[in-house]
């Protein structure tokens, strides 16, 4: 999941104003995306495509293994079946969501499809499939075998699944559904994350846009957009030299990332900004100003907002506080961002990555 999510966040961030190509890149994917010059024959998108397809395939394998376990009604088997159904469906749903958000047969416009299991599947259908997988994950995690398992935080797992459902609802502009889900998502002490301090591997975001960033870097535009101490604390950035003879050649990197730190999919900041947006949209009761300040004051109390936030202001805040998670692209696609970034987006030829050339051959 971590590699698939990280590579998706990087590609999506490069389609908007979060990321751009590195100063002296080895790989050309981010140059092709940021220059709006990527085609099916480019080939640079193939690794991400394969990564996401593999992520989905491995998730389905987990489901198949769970389904093949004997129906002997033992405690161990019941737990394995339930846990496999929960994990397999959760990740299958997220893999489909990432595929739909990253790739399309119509890169310049909505309404595209991707190739899945040798069939063309529309984005709309992929999102429906993802939603169904999340719902099935919820069914499995509510089985008695999991509730009875020692050491397993059943309630946290339920909140985790509902957070995935919530984010999908927001991306699809199903705001009434999101208003129901937001109370069921993670709390202030939780986050949906991929942990890297156990198996020896490194956080892939750190590897890509940490101090050794080469192929991709944070945009100067995003660096300059951090106008308060709170924003600079929330998104600390530094410059790393790439040419000892020329100090003006550097990459801008995310200095808060650590080699063994967690890769965050969603956290409390997501939830509070979603609540604020839903309140402003009139589908949730509450105080939008309180919600945004719960995020801001965590980083610097004196930077608390004093005016009731508009949707435009929420988009600006989300750009900083939820940076590098793929949310910026989703916000522009769903029309939350209405500024110059949205205008530039409309002018792009590549709003989704094109499918690799071989996937377009002999289409069904």
Describe the predicted segments one by one:
Residues 260-281, 290:
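Internal helical hairpin/lid segments
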Residues 1-94, 98, 102, 106-125, ...:
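Short acidic-aromatic linear motifs embedded in glycine-rich loops, typified by GG[WY][YF]DAGD(H)
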């Amino acid at each position: 999941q971590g590699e698939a999510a990280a590579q998706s966040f990087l590609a999506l961030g490069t389609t908007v104003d979060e990321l751009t190509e590195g100063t002296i890149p080895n790989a050309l994917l981010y140059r092709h995306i940021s220059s709006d010059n990527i085609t099916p024959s480019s080939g640079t998108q193939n690794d991400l495509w394969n990564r996401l397809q593999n992520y989905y395939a491995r998730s389905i394998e987990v489901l198949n293994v769970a389904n093949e376990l004997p129906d002997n009604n033992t405690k161990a088997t019941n737990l394995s079946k339930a846990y496999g159904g929960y994990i397999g469906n959760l990740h299958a749903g997220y893999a489909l969501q990432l595929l739909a958000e990253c790739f399309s047969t119509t890169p310049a416009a909505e309404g595209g499809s991707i190739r899945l299991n040798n069939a063309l599947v529309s984005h709309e259908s992929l999102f429906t499939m993802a939603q169904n997988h999340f719902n099935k994950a919820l069914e499995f995690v509510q089985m008695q075998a999991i509730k009875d398992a020692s050491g397993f935080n059943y309630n946290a797992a339920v909140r985790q699944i509902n957070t995935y459902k919530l984010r999908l609802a927001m991306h699809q502009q199903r705001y009434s559904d999101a208003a129901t889900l937001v109370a069921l998502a993670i709390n202030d002490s939780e986050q949906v994350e991929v942990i890297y301090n156990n198996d020896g591997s490194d956080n892939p975001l750190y590897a890509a846009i940490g101090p050794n960033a080469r192929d991709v870097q944070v945009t100067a535009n995003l660096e300059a957009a951090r106008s308060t101490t709170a924003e600079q604390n929330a998104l600390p950035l530094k410059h790393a030299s790439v040419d000892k003879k020329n100090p003006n050649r550097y990459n801008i990197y995310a200095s808060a990332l650590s080699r063994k730190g967690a890769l965050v999919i969603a956290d409390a900041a997501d939830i509070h900004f979603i609540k604020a947006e839903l309140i402003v949209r009139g589908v949730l009761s509450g105080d939008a100003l309180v919600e945004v300040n719960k995020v801001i004051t965590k980083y610097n109390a004196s930077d608390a907002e004093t005016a009731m936030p508009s949707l435009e202001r929420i988009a600006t805040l989300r750009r900083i506080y939820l940076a590098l998670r793929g949310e910026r692209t989703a916000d522009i696609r769903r029309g939350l961002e209405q500024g110059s970034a949205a205008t530039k987006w409309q002018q792009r030829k590549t709003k989704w990555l094109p499918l690799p050339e071989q996937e377009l051959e002999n289409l069904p």
